[in-house]
């Protein structure tokens, strides 16, 4: 299991999808899993956080299904809070090969989000609030990973989608030497431009 972190607009959703296609893994975006329930629209629109226990239940269900089917997993943007991270460390630390953080300057993130069509990306206050929540939580989350000796790698998220994907593929192979490329043509094909959560 690999965990992929990044601010809204960092490209982690796009890159998680690319990695899942390259390695034949499953990827789960915490934002998409939550949106698919249709139960938290008001919170999402304001850039807020869903109750931790609800998120844990939703994500763990997806993880268990993928594991039962024999898939390796990329977690896109989960855990989002220290509480979620503590639960993950208590129950799944041994399954996690490493965490990757996509680093992108905020000016670039604002430009990317301005081009996205999602409703929750149109409100600047909502975007700023999402950035603040991420920054308030990420350091304590990564500290929990490091306390369990789970490698944390920062990757430059600026460049073409293919360039960033190549960097991530190299890191994934370092974190999980058993990772085998299933599809060498992903970078040359069309990857959905979701730019993550």
Q: Model regions: which residues?
A:
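Glycine-rich phosphate-binding loop of ATP-dependent small-molecule kinases
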Residues: 1-197
């Amino acid at each position: 299991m690999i965990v992929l972190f990044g601010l809204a607009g960092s490209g982690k959703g796009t890159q998680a999808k690319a990695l899942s296609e390259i390695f034949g893994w499953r990827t789960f975006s915490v934002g998409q899993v939550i949106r698919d329930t249709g139960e938290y629209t008001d919170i999402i629109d304001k850039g807020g956080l869903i109750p931790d226990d609800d998120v844990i239940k939703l994500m763990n269900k997806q993880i268990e299904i993928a594991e039962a089917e024999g898939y390796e997993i990329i977690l896109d943007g989960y855990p989002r809070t220290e509480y979620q991270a503590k639960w993950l460390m208590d129950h799944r630390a041994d399954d996690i090969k490493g965490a990757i953080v996509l680093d992108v300057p905020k000016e670039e993130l604002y430009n990317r989000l301005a081009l996205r069509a999602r409703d929750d990306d149109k409100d600047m206050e909502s975007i700023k609030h999402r950035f603040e929540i991420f920054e308030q939580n990420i350091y304590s989350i990564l500290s929990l990973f490091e306390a369990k000796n789970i490698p944390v790698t920062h990757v430059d998220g600026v460049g073409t989608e293919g360039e960033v994907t190549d960097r991530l593929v190299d890191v994934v192979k370092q974190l999980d030497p058993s990772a085998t490329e299933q599809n060498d043509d992903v970078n040359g094909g069309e990857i959905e431009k979701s730019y993550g959560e």
